[in-house]
Amino acid sequence: MTQEVLERSIQVGGRTMTFQTGKIGKQAGGAIFCRYGDTVVSAFATGSAQPREGIDFFPLTVEFEERLYAAGKIPGGFIKREGRPSEKAILSARLIDRPIRPLFPEGYRNDVQVVAQVMSVDQDCASDITGINAASAALTISNVPFEGPVAAVTVGLIGDEFIINPTVEQSEKSVMHLTVAGTKDAVMMVEAGAQEVPEAQMLEAIMFGHREIQRIAEFIENYRLEALERNLAKPKQEVVMKQMPEEIVQAVKAFAYDKMDQAVRTEEKKAREEAIRQVKEEALAHFAEQYPEDSKTIDKILEDFVHKIVRRLITVEHIRPDGRALDEIRPISVEVGILPRTHGTGLFTRGQTQVLTVATLGAVGDEQILDGLGLEESKRYMHHYNFPPYSVGETRPMRGPGRREIGHGALAERALLPVIPDENDFPYTIRLVSEVLESNGSSSMASVCGSTLSLMDAGVPVKSPVAGIAMGLISEENHIAILSDIQGMEDHDGDMDFKVAGTSQGVTALQMDIKIKGVSREILERALTQAKEGRLFILDKMLSVIEKPRPELSPFAPRIITASIHPDKIREVIGPGGKTIKKIIDETGVKIDIEDDGRVFISAVDGEAGENALKIIQALTQEVEVGRIYNGRVTRIMDFGAFVEVIPGVLGLSGKEGLVHISQLAHGRVEKVEDVVKLGDDILVKATGIDKQGRLNLSRKEALPNPNPSSNPNPNGITANRNPRNS
């Protein structure tokens, strides 16, 4: 049987991206085998035949499956198979979800599942970018009514040059890591981390990426047309939208629209929610007898009224639900140092959004080890975001962090990363935890502000303070409104959530999600400009409370002492089976981390304990210098000489000793060793050399003054200090 396969390629960033269909996954709605360099991602898109009943949302799920065989690895542990998705996989799934979600028909309620499976990894060709393009192509050739295609690229910036899909080496030099996704017509999604890049340059980078996206999107569209000709793509599913009965719509509108309009204008969130709830209850009770089977329909009509009223108020009347101007920021309250024994705290309140961020400083060994499909790395700065149900007045089971929490934590982490001090200047592991205590929108950006406050309160020498703001967009007919510091209702009923974080000098992080079919350059430019104004306002509020990092660390934070030893001496500090280093830790109560290059990090809450540990390590690794005179102690007497310890032992371990041959004890002839020295004597000796076996040779004779028979009654120098030396 002949197998029909369609394979086409396009050059992206100087490398070949190949799309293939017809060979694998033929029972899926659409299947694409995508190779970019040596990275291979297979994407499968499948939709259900019928809509899911009784829901008011689009049931789209996106899975990003990492297989360790893709990197030539076997999973650890007893089970030896992949478990829960990694944080990287969750963030990659979100990257795919966000640009494709707005491109399904409004009101479409069929289940759709997109699975991107990483099968081979080339570190220079990112699997998440490959996954977005593969998923878009799979949806485009499937029967799912997807209004794409979309495409995605990463943009780097080295000097003044933008680079599409930079390699690992280029990424290390780049001051920007920007992911852009979009259609041929508009930008759909932006995700960025940057080193204080100016807004104008960030905008140019987005548009530079979009020009490459247009080329890839057109390629995918042409690929679909060719696949259709060969029966390798499927006709799109016909979408039948459930229409609201016009009679009920008009009846509900006549009874409830004006009441709902007044309810929406209530400024305080909880009072507004209660007012809207009362209008709904009143309407449902009023129509219970007339339309007894249509309570869900009536509830949906009322929700649509809220949506339309919010949008009309903002775009036509320029009135926001809480009464603010379009560019006005909610009242801000800032506090630091509110927890007594933590290392640093920042409480940031903006309107009805409140976040407490706590900073904890740890030893080098507290770094997070990342061992996924990429190279094994460690992370010394991390941010974790928690969004409990009580923050929005709800109850639900509290389990582990969800995708949203992981995504928000990663965004806030990325925003502060450029201002975290270098390890050489501040050798601490830093963990931030943001607890959302109250939320009415923009909690991730409040976490950014809280992070800056907690770091400065902890005495971390951040390079610049960072603040964040969430911008919104409502586009209604010929009216466009860009909102600063959006709250929950504006996010829910708006068209864009554009989060911007940065310093006074430039942007450090961006994230844009939209619900419409894209945004133009003009809108992006206006949003970035307005966001900068808001960010500078917020920074002023923060700096009025804590202007710069505290000069001293918290008394409860560990003190880290750094030292450097020769790499060959590492084994002497560690000892057989780790015995020596365990003794040091038990004796002093410190934490010790040793890098392969010989850097030693001693972490101790008690500074004296850290100094004691350092002295022990210095004693263990101290080298005997040939030619130097030492005050040593006689440890053994032999017929042929005396063994002398020149560097004392520590922790019950032997020190460094060498042999003073009998011929080197004195200037004259010595018949018997005991005539010159006794066990336990402290004597001056000179290190004269180290033989091929690593044995140390010492000489007492060379440490003595030159003999002068006329003035020295004891030319053999047969004297010794019988007093025990200080050890």
Curated annotation (Swiss-Prot):
GO terms for cellular component: cytosol. Residues 558-617 form the KH domain. Keywords: Cytoplasm, Magnesium, Metal-binding, Nucleotidyltransferase, RNA-binding, Transferase. Residues 717-727 have a biased composition (Polar residues). GO terms for molecular function: 3'-5'-RNA exonuclease activity; magnesium ion binding; polyribonucleotide nucleotidyltransferase activity; RNA binding. It is found in: Cytoplasm. Residues 627-701 form the S1 motif domain. Pfam families: KH_1, PNPase, RNase_PH, RNase_PH_C, S1. It comes from the Bacteria. Its cofactor is Mg(2+). GO terms for biological process: mRNA catabolic process; RNA processing. Residues 698-727 are annotated as: Disordered. Mg(2+) binds at residues 491, 497. Belongs to the polyribonucleotide nucleotidyltransferase family. NCBIfam families: polynuc_phos, PRK11824.1. This is Polyribonucleotide nucleotidyltransferase.
